[in-house]
């Protein structure tokens, strides 16, 4: 972000995300910390995924809190909460174990795998001013 390298470790114990800068000498310095709440749903964070889209850097955090959160990096390394997707009956995002992000045709496609529910979650993220997400659920048959 703006030529600066950042590291975002998650603490499952404290339910927080911490943003650290990494300078050329390898020294880490704290920049920001975000605590989980019912509005963010990354308690016990186990999975983080980062990506860039149209010049912006993003982080997705998921844990054992039945959902995931999308954050954008500000120019000074602060995490700006954009959206949270909470688990519902038709979205297998409880206890997410893996996240995959791909940019297809300019759209951000987010795929999730749950450790406790069948299926693959598929979300199309709209990173416009509304920063909302649309969800689809894809189910795979067990072939052996």
Question: What residues fall within each predicted segment?
Answer:
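Feature marking well-ordered beta-strand scaffolds used for ligand recognition
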Residues: 1-144
């Amino acid at each position: 972000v703006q030529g600066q390298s950042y590291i975002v470790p998650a603490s499952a114990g404290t339910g927080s995300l911490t943003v650290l800068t990494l300078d050329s000498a390898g020294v880490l310095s704290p920049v920001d910390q975000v605590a989980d709440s019912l509005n963010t749903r990354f308690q016990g964070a186990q999975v983080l995924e980062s990506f860039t889209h149209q010049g912006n850097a993003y982080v997705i955090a998921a844990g054992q809190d039945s959902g995931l959160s999308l954050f954008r990096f500000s120019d000074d390394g602060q995490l700006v909460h954009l959206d949270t997707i909470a688990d519902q009956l038709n979205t297998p995002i409880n206890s997410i174990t893996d996240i995959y992000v791909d940019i297809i045709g300019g759209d951000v496609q987010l795929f999730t795998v749950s450790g406790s529910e069948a299926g693959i979650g598929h979300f199309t993220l709209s990173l416009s001013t509304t920063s909302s997400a649309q969800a689809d659920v894809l189910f795979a048959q067990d072939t052996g």
